[in-house]
Design a protein with these regions (language model features):
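Single conserved hydrophobic/aromatic residue that forms the stacking wall/gate
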Residues: 1-3, 228-239
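Conserved ATP-binding/catalytic segment of the ANL
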Residues: 50-54, 63-65, 69-124
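Generic structural signal for well-ordered beta-strand positions
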Residues: 65-66, 113, 130, 213, ...
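Gly/Ser/Thr-rich phosphate-binding loop
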Residues: 4-42, 145-147
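Ser/Thr-glycine-rich phosphate-binding loops at phosphate-binding pockets of nucleotides
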Residues: 26-30, 100, 124-125, 213-215, ...
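Conserved C-terminal "lid"/linker of ANL adenylate-forming enzymes
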Residues: 122, 147-155, 187-227, 231
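AMP-binding/adenylate-forming catalytic core of the ANL superfamily
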Residues: 74, 79-80, 103-196
Length: 239
């Protein structure tokens, strides 16, 4: 499988019932595969091993860093973007490695473990790396949450949530009191499953689906100031 949003619980379930599966990792600039492992060699939580025709390294800003950017090179890596030297220079290091923009680790056996995107990582007040995508995956598995977006707001983590209003309506639960009870319980369950520095201070309901790119990724940059528009725990009119 090559998927955008991984679900640890689903992977663990497949693994437990001995369902044969594996997960690869790649990008268009690499034609497109970077890492892969046969299902019977797949390490749970990883994205396989780097291809034989490639090299990979984890570039860390400091030796103490928990993760680093996954950088690759090899014969299947593009030479550059067509007629766009500026973008090409941005994506390659001076010594010729392609910056994937993904943060992760690599174990002694060459298995790659992806944690999140470099540009979306949040640095906690105590210096730990917070990967919003991991928290969003957990949130999206909770009752009546269709999609979510974790942002930093006033130095705290806040989850913007687009609820399953259709399901809530069908059960007669789409009112402020019920929504607050449901989301308070979701917040409690989420925070019980994450580290102290990853705890969410608030779930804030969002009135519409989040805007997405053609690849169905949320346009995160649009939502840094969304909280100033929404205050009530119910479904408001679209902004």
């Amino acid at each position: 499988m090559c998927i955008r949003d991984r679900d640890k619980e689903v992977e663990e379930f497949f693994y437990k019932i001995k369902f044969p599966f594996t997960i690869g990792y790649g990008m268009t600039e690499c034609g497109p595969l970077i890492s892969y492992a046969p299902w019977n060699e797949f390490v749970l939580g990883s994205s396989g091993k780097i291809l034989d025709i490639m090299e990979a390294r984890i570039y860390k800003e400091s030796p103490e860093a928990e993760t680093g950017e996954i950088q690759v090179r090899g014969e299947n890596v593009m030479v550059g973007y067509y007629k766009n030297p500026e973008a090409t220079n941005e994506v390659f290091t001076e010594d010729g490695w392609l910056r994937t923009g993904d943060l992760g680790t690599m174990d002694a056996n060459g298995n790659i473990f992806i944690r999140g995107r470099l540009k979306t990582m949040i640095l906690s007040s105590s210096g730990q790396n917070i990967f919003p995508e991991e928290l969003e995956t957990k949130l999206n598995n909770l009752p009546f949450i269709l999609e979510s977006l974790v942002i930093e707001y006033n130095k705290k983590l806040v989850a913007l949530v687009y609820a399953d209003y259709e399901a809530l309506d069908s059960l007669g639960l789409n009112n402020p009191d019920n929504l607050k009870t449901i989301m308070d319980e979701n917040l409690k369950n989420l925070n019980n499953s994450v580290a102290a520095y990853e705890k969410i201070s608030k779930i804030q309901l969002y009135p519409t689906e989040f805007e997405k790119t053609p690849k169905r990724s949320i346009k995160r940059y649009l939502y840094n100031l969304s909280l100033i528009h929404i205050s009530e725990p119910t479904r408001p009119e679209p902004i």
